[in-house]
Amino acid sequence: MYLDEYKRWLAADLEDSDLHPELAGIEGNDDEIKDRFAVALKFGTAGLRGVLGAGTNRMNIYVVRQATQGLANWVKTQGGNQTVAISYDSRIKSDVFAKTAAAVLAANGIKVRIYDALMPVPALSFATRYYECNAGIMVTASHNPAKYNGYKAYGPDGCQMTDDAAAIVYEEIQKTDVLNGAKYISFAEGVEQGLIRFVGDDCKNAFYEAIEARQVRPGLCKTAGLKLVYSPLNGSGLVPVTRVLNDIGITDITIVPEQEYPNGYFTTCSYPNPEIFEALKLGLDLAKESGADLMLATDPDADRVGIAMKCPDGSYELVTGNEMGVLLLDYICAGRKELGTLPEKAVAVKSIVSTPLADAVAAHYGVEMRSVLTGFKWIGDQIASLEAAGEVDRFIFGFEESYGYLAGPYVRDKDAVISSMLICEMAAYYRSIGSSIKERLEEIYAEYGRYLNVVDSFEFPGLTGMDKMSGIMQGLRDNPPASIGDKKVVSVTDYKNTEATGLPAANVLTYGLDNGATVVVRPSGTEPKIKTYFTTLGKDLADAQATKDELAAALAPLFK
């Protein structure tokens, strides 16, 4: 069957000139043909993500057309404005895929608001809400290597699409022939007909104003003299991040030159992920050279930000996603409490795999901390529930350990633009009182205990990878470990059991150990990986690290 589909593509008059040579080049290579055509990329709540190239299991204009036709079929049942917002990042063919999606929607009589240049995830979420759209599309593969691209779908609230809506869209996609089933006109024709319009300056300015309104101490940065090194990692963050920072008074910004402008090949780092050192190295080197107070790097779609801080002794230290989540929570709560802007019954939200240190900090300030499933849409869901109750102003902060933060209800996905602003403001504040981010972090550890949070990943590539991952997770359910190393398991939480957790079902297992440590095991939602999240508490960092290392060594054989 996959050979027949391959032959159909090979014989077709394909519009993308890159695809036919690829197809001709794999003729007779059964393994390669099978990998490209035996299955199709599956549309889920995170949309699509895959390697660029020819085939149903690849990202190309035909797969994008098919997906967009499925989305269009759903939009047409939703009433409302019959409008979809679109943005894209710097990845290879992101602009092509964005215009392709716009053209399919226009051919279906659906209006489109598309950015005239690359803009990040939060800008897409904002435009979806601003124009009261039925849906939004963000063409990106986040921090994946250059050979990937993807297609994130958003609901009318600017949050990633719900499970129910995604399932309906997927059904419609399956009814649509990938090569010729989608309605299609040219992008130019869609513009000429008035169906495709660019996002206006009114929307762009409103986005920046919404972010800048969330400063904790407005005006502080104008006189702080903060010195910053910033890298957009060749992605979409350059314009919005520098615009907001300049607006609030941070003007001493040095951009990492090799990573300044959009480049989907990501030639300076094979994996443009601000969680890893390789992506931050050039920025860190430049920070050391220039004596900057802070170095920030945003990922290609600018929804996550990595940080290196200057320590009192002049050295530089990377800050983890959990640490920055706690630091921002502490800064926002303390600052707003001091200034009288902390709402009554304030609410913060974190994912279940993020550090419990955040719970302790929230409790200290009288803030309700809610824990939700992994995936920022669940944080967005909590904002929506507050909004439905007329209490959206209670939301002050949400974060995930994977370097994603949000400090306001103006969008419903993580936002590296506001995160960059607040991190800089926080650094400027501590600088103004003769302290530093590093010193405040150590004060937090002294007050609440030395938490260590580490994520390990195990990769399962290829067609058999998903089956192997499923088998491992099922094995853990069928034969739960009584101990991990020499630490006894005292509690097991299976998030597929909705009655026990009070949350939607999820393929996540949490083990509580007799020494107070926790281990969370879950498959990645976007990559062929199983992730293990370790939280250990020790008298100092070395003690907490030693416990983590023992637990990781004991678990590793289960993932082979």
Ranges and model annotations:
Residues 288, 292-294, 315, 335-522, ...:
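Phosphate-binding and adjacent anionic-ligand microenvironments
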Residues 4-101, 108, 191, 196-224, ...:
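An N-terminal, well-structured beta->alpha segment
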Residues 32-41, 149-279, 286-287:
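Gly/Ser/Thr-enriched, mixed-charge loops and adjacent short helices
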